[in-house]
């Protein structure tokens, strides 16, 4: 910090010295008895003198008319004390001796101040020529590598048409995923194809000649090795700088005071989360050594611990519909055309016009559609009273109901808060069960008071008949009399 202040003080002192030198030079060039104006007015006078010297007296008269109210151009009048200085500069401008000291000073000042800000430009090191037949091997299994190289060899021999047809044919085959442009192995595969193509289709003799020259004169390799070594050291230094910057960023991230943050919500893991059926964790080494088919199976096939339940079929197996047989209705078949099993007995068949118009389909081809069962014929589900809320719960759902009620109340509150944030309505259904229970107790004509089950239609009709008979006072014995 102190060095920076000393540098700024040094620049300020140098600028003041240069400014004083420029003033001294200008004052020495001005004849005796001429008043030297201040720097701001002096710059205007110098510019005006240069323009008037180029454009003539008409331009001076135009400035005098346009700037009558401007005091900065008062030097154009003969009674102004700075008018002699203007005449002196006008004479120098006409003779070509006028110099812009202010412009030179500002330019020099700007360059002086901008000099320490400039960063040193690093020397660019040209990249060496790449190796022709050397390619870093990606993480791939030996089986996939053999398939890739064999495919690249055939593609180099037969051309791009073979590659296009093969990629279309094996598009769904995971063993040939390296043919897809979005696969990570596709660039490596294309470089291998280029290497095989350069060897098979375009044989060149320059590599052999170069190798022979290297054997004859080993010291000639130094001129090729040195640029590559410089490039390698340069790349290592760049990687080191990037690593240091990453370490600095991690250090700054670690210095964050995490206690300043506010906890919005806490997620708690229960025992059910610990015993949940999740996929087995994969290892990096297993992923690198696995083949393309195994990788595809890892992400697509379900785990063996899972059991997949299938619903029973709702229809019989489908069979193709056979064409209806041609029959002659109302005509007796001759004995020669009769089947041998029937012994030549003729048979006549008569069909109604309606049946003749519509072909008869096999019953096996029509799926069985399950019709909805009326509530009156549905089996009655036994109900149980919940010990927590007192509401009626089906006996088959009582276990799940108890599990939900025994959950941590804090988790339930957090879940309610989350659902209230996601919901677009502010309606609550807290007393729905109580309202339904009160409705059941009041509507005895629709629900049974004892178990809360809906009364069947037969029971309703029976009650209506009983109420009608009691209203008229009619009994079976009275009707007989």
Curated annotation (Swiss-Prot):
PROSITE patterns: SURP (PS50128). SURP motif repeats lie at residues 44-86, 147-189. GO terms for molecular function: RNA binding. Residues 1-34, 335-373, 452-481 are annotated as: Disordered. One of its GO terms (cellular component) is U2 snRNP. Signal peptide: none annotated. Belongs to the 40S cdc5-associated complex (or cwf complex), a spliceosome sub-complex reminiscent of a late-stage spliceosome composed of the U2, U5 and U6 snRNAs and at least brr2, cdc5, cwf2/prp3, cwf3/syf1, cwf4/syf3, cwf5/ecm2, spp42/cwf6, cwf7/spf27, cwf8, cwf9, cwf10, cwf11, cwf12, prp45/cwf13, cwf14, cwf15, cwf16, cwf17, cwf18, cwf19, cwf20, cwf21, cwf22, cwf23, cwf24, cwf25, cwf26, cyp7/cwf27, cwf28, cwf29/ist3, lea1, msl1, prp5/cwf1, prp10, prp12/sap130, prp17, prp22, sap61, sap62, sap114, sap145, slu7, smb1, smd1, smd3, smf1, smg1 and syf2. This is Pre-mRNA-splicing factor sap114.
């Amino acid at each position: 910090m102190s060095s920076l202040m000393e540098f700024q003080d040094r620049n300020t002192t140098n600028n003041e010295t240069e400014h004083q030198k420029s003033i001294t030079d200008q004052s020495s060039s001005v004849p005796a008895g001429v008043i030297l104006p201040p720097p701001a007015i002096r710059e205007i006078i110098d510019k005006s003198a240069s323009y008037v010297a180029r454009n003539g007296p008409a331009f001076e008269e135009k400035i005098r008319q346009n700037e009558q109210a401007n005091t900065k151009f008062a030097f154009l009048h003969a009674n102004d004390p700075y008018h002699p200085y203007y005449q002196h500069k006008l004479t120098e401008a006409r003779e070509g001796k006028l110099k812009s000291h202010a412009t030179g000073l500002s330019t020099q000042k700007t360059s002086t101040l901008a000099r320490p800000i400039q960063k040193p430009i690093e020397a660019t090191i040209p990249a060496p020529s790449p190796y022709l037949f050397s390619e870093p091997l990606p993480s791939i299994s030996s089986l996939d590598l053999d398939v890739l190289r064999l495919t690249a060899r055939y593609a180099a021999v037969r051309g791009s048409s073979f590659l296009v047809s093969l990629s279309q044919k094996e598009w769904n085959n995971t063993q040939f995923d390296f043919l897809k442009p979005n696969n990570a192995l596709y660039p490596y595969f294309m470089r291998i194809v280029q290497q095989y193509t350069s060897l098979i289709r375009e044989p060149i003799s320059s590599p052999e000649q170069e190798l022979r020259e290297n054997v004859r004169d080993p010291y000639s390799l130094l001129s090729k090795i040195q640029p590559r070594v410089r490039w390698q050291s340069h790349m290592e230094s760049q990687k080191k700088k990037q690593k240091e910057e990453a370490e600095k960023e991690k250090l700054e991230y670690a210095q964050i005071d995490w206690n300043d943050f506010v906890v919005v919500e806490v997620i708690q893991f229960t025992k059910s989360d610990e015993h949940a059926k999740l996929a087995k964790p994969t290892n990096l080494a297993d992923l690198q050594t696995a083949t393309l088919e195994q990788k595809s199976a890892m992400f697509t096939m379900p785990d063996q611990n899972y059991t997949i339940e299938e619903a029973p079929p709702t229809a019989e197996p489908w069979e193709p519909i056979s064409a209806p047989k041609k029959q002659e209705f109302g005509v007796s078949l001759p004995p020669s055309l009769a089947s041998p099993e029937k012994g030549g007995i003729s048979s006549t068949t008569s069909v109604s016009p309606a049946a003749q118009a519509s072909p008869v389909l096999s019953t096996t081809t029509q799926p069985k559609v399950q019709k909805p069962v009326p509530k009156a014929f549905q089996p009655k589900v036994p109900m149980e009273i919940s010990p927590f809320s007192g509401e009626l719960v089906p006996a088959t759902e009582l276990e799940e109901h108890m599990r939900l009620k025994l959950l941590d109340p804090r988790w339930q509150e957090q879940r309610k808060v989350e659902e209230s944030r996601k919901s677009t309505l502010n309606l609550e259904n807290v007393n729905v069960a109580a309202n339904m229970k009160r409705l059941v107790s009041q509507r005895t004509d629709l629900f049974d008071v004892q178990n809360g089950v809906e009364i069947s239609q037969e029971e309703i009709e029976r009650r209506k008949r009983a109420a009608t008979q009691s209203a008229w006072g009619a009994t079976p014995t009275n009707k007989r009399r």
